[in-house]
Amino acid sequence: DVCDSLVEGRCIHNGCWCDEEAPHGNCCDTAGCTAWWWCPGTKWD
């Protein structure tokens, strides 16, 4: 798959990821910007 970005060596396929410790308040997009909403469908390789 073509990855939008990498976080800790893992691919982001939907353009954002969430910290498992704070899934509703600590999301980031591929630009590294903090987003204050849940990112549904986050998929890691």
Curated annotation (Swiss-Prot):
GO terms for molecular function: ion channel regulator activity; toxin activity. GO terms for cellular component: extracellular region. The modification 4-hydroxyproline is found at residues 23, 40. It is found in: Secreted. Keywords: Bromination, Disulfide bond, Gamma-carboxyglutamic acid, Hydroxylation, Ion channel impairing toxin, Neurotoxin, Secreted, Toxin. Coiled coil: none annotated. The keyword Secreted applies. The modification 6'-bromotryptophan is found at residues 17, 37-38, 44. Disulfide bonds join 3-16, 11-28, 18-33, 27-39. The modification 4-carboxyglutamate is found at residue 21. Expressed by the venom duct. The keyword Secreted applies. Mu-conotoxins block voltage-gated sodium channels. This toxin reversibly blocks voltage-gated sodium channel in cephalopods, with no alteration in the voltage dependence of sodium conductance or on the kinetics of inactivation. The cysteine framework is XII (C-C-C-C-CC-C-C). This is Mu-conotoxin-like Cal 12.1.1d.
